[in-house]
Amino acid sequence: MTTIEIAGRLVGTGQPTFVIAEVSANHGGDLPRVLEMVRVAAAAGADAVKLQTFTADSMTLDVDLPRFVVGAGNPWSGRRLHDLYREAAMPWDWYPEIAAVAASEGITLFSSPFDPASVDFLVEQG
């Protein structure tokens, strides 16, 4: 396995485990909740917190066609995919405050972008 460096830490064979706390859609549309998740992850000893950067429009079409509605047999039955992705997407204007809290807590922050616009946004954020 290749050894890589993430935020000054070596990651690879023979290196200590690099623990990543995944926030993704667990924010529930609540910025204070995200900030608390970052603080708790840092206090628990995680090395990094990972977000997901996307918009509903970059994930699916905003249509009512049957193939874009969740089928029976799961908790989201009858829900439109676009609505679910809109709820799961983290507002981009939250990122500066999340980054500031992560920096103050000494935990690395990064995100998985899902489309070119998200990549551009994250590059702009530093």
Where does each model-flagged region fall?
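Hydrophobic faces of well-ordered beta-strands that scaffold small-molecule active sites
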Residues: 19-21, 49-51, 109-112
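Catalytic domains of carbohydrate-active enzymes, especially glycoside hydrolases
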Residues: 36-55, 125-126
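Active-site beta->alpha loop and helix N-cap motifs at the rims of alpha/beta catalytic domains
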Residues: 74-126
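Glycine-rich, proline-tolerant flexible connector loops at the mouths of alpha/beta enzymes
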Residues: 47-89
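N-terminal amphipathic alpha-helix/helix-capping segment at the start of soluble metabolic enzymes
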Residues: 1-20, 95
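Active-site beta-loop-alpha junctions enriched in small/polar residues
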Residues: 24-26, 52-56, 114-116
